[in-house]
Design a protein with these regions (language model features):
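Active-site-adjacent structural elements that line small-molecule/cofactor binding pockets in enzymes
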Residues: 1-243
Length: 244
């Protein structure tokens, strides 16, 4: 999708829902995007495309007439005619040091997933380094976490939910270039319960989950979005709302 279309959609949502919309961007996954039959670039090029796209989105959010001639995208003179009262913040999904630094330079915040504390600290520092190089205040940069978990009434059920519904949580390799759900299905057969260790908390104990969430808040995350991988969503929301 051309970044101009993304910018228009984002600006329209922000105009409709003032203060409630932010734009999250990433470098993509083949599983979702190869189906249109276009060229699927290697990771470095996808990242470069993403940052050029952000440049275009930023220009359009200014409300001025915009023209762009870049390495990957072109834009004839145009502008966004529907602008929100508040420009939506742009958050980038990433987990690598080089991309994290550039995210600090160009974006308003970072989205990442649960990881060991040492890696999280590295990502934080690279983002703050990028902020300083760009002349912006690192204190205004937002860190957002998507935390996968599996909760159920018993540990056995929680593990079964993880194995059945979210086996990719135990896959210890990059998955961005996998093109077919059938390939995922075959790879999922290789996942064992121990593969989730240190990658996703699987527990029936709400207090264990509360401690896990608090651990990431203590690291410095501003927001933590929870993803319970099982289908027991209503029960999970009730229990976590009451006990976590």
């Amino acid at each position: 999708m051309h970044p101009a279309i993304v910018a228009q959609a984002s600006a329209t949502l922000a105009a409709m829902y003032t203060g409630r919309h932010w734009l999250g961007l990433g470098s993509g996954e083949a599983l979702n995007e190869h189906i249109v039959g276009g060229y699927w670039p290697e990771t470095p090029e996808r990242i470069a495309r993403m940052f050029e796209a952000i440049e275009i989105v930023r220009k359009l959010f200014s409300g001025k007439d915009v023209k762009h001639e870049g390495k990957f995208y072109k834009l004839e003179t145009t502008r966004l005619w529907t602008l929100p009262e508040q420009t939506p913040p742009i958050y980038i999904a990433t987990a690598g040091p080089i991309t994290a630094k550039k995210t600090g330079m160009l974006a308003d915040g970072l989205i990442t997933v649960g990881a060991p504390e040492q890696k999280i600290e590295m990502i934080f520092e690279k983002c703050r380094e990028g902020c300083r190089e760009a002349g912006s205040d690192p204190a205004r940069f937002r860190f957002i976490l998507q935390l996968h978990l599996s909760w159920a009434e018993t540990d056995e059920e929680a593990l079964r939910n993880a194995m059945d519904e979210w086996p990719n949580g135990g896959m210890k390799f990059p998955k961005q270039d996998i093109r077919s759900p059938f390939d995922f299905e075959q790879m999922a057969k290789l996942v064992r319960p121990e593969d989730f260790t240190g990658r996703m908390l699987i527990s029936s104990d709400p207090e264990a989950h509360r401690r896990e969430i608090q651990k990431f808040l203590d690291m410095g995350f501003d927001q933590v979005y929870l993803h319970n991988v099982g289908r027991n969503q209503a029960q999970w929301i009730e229990v976590f709302g009451r006990e976590v």
